[in-house]
């Protein structure tokens, strides 16, 4: 017998969300009661735009560092295959507003303060596709996203 599985992100109506936003996807509890929160960090409007791979890859590496500098409990921040944003997985309970503030602050630093030397994991030893990075694109996208404002509500614009 095949187990029925529903993947929440495929149930989301991508035509009614209003990016950029942070959305709480789920809170799950492990066998010992540990809480994990999963967020949809949507940076660009689905089916209207996508971030090219090199820019997204550099944003991914920078967020891995910058988010951890701003909030405890980050497990992982992985890009969506559609290249419109990231899954952010956290230990503990966090609100969409708190995460949106962290993302905004991180993107502001990417847009204005980061140099190539600040990007972690860009060598052949530390990255599985080290030649596919673009700090220029990461900075451009970060500024575009900041200019639009990041909402803590995916369906109505509530910019933080």
Swiss-Prot record:
Any one GO BP annotation for this protein: quorum sensing
Cofactor(s) essential for the protein: Fe cation
Residues involved in Fe cation binding: 57, 61, 127
A GO molecular function held by the record: iron ion binding
CC cofactor note: Binds 1 Fe cation per subunit.
Catalytic activity, reaction form: S-(5-deoxy-D-ribos-5-yl)-L-homocysteine = (S)-4,5-dihydroxypentane-2,3-dione + L-homocysteine
EC number(s) per entry: 4.4.1.21
Keyword Zinc annotated: no
Keywords assigned by UniProt, alphabetized: Autoinducer synthesis, Iron, Lyase, Metal-binding, Quorum sensing
Keyword Aminoacyl-tRNA synthetase: no
Disulfide bonds: none
Gene3D superfamilies: S-ribosylhomocysteinase (LuxS)
Uppermost EC category: lyase
InterPro entries, alphabetized: LuxS_sf, Metalloenz_LuxS/M16, S-ribosylhomocysteinase
Family: Belongs to the LuxS family.
The protein's role, per its UniProt record: Involved in the synthesis of autoinducer 2 (AI-2) which is secreted by bacteria and is used to communicate both the cell density and the metabolic potential of the environment. The regulation of gene expression in response to changes in cell density is called quorum sensing. Catalyzes the transformation of S-ribosylhomocysteine (RHC) to homocysteine (HC) and 4,5-dihydroxy-2,3-pentadione (DPD).
Subunit structure: Homodimer.
Protein name as annotated: S-ribosylhomocysteine lyase
Native source species: Streptococcus pyogenes serotype M2 (strain MGAS10270)
Lineage of origin: Bacteria, Bacillati, Bacillota, Bacilli, Lactobacillales
């Amino acid at each position: 017998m095949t187990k029925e599985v529903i993947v929440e992100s495929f149930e989301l109506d991508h035509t009614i969300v209003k990016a950029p936003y942070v959305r709480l996807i789920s809170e799950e509890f492990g066998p010992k009661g540990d809480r994990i929160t999963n967020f949809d960090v949507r940076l660009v409007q689905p089916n209207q735009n996508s971030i090219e791979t090199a820019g997204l890859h550099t944003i991914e590496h920078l967020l891995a560092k910058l988010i951890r500098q701003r909030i405890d409990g980050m497990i992982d921040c992985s890009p969506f295959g559609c290249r419109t944003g990231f899954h952010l997985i956290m230990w503990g309970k966090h609100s969409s507003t708190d995460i949106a503030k962290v993302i905004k602050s991180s993107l502001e630093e990417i847009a204005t303060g980061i140099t190539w030397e600040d990007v972690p994991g860009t060598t052949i030893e530390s990255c599985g596709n080290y030649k596919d990075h673009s700090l220029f694109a990461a900075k451009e996208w970060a500024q575009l996203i900041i200019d639009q404002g990041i909402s803590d509500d995916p369906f109505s614009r509530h910019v933080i």
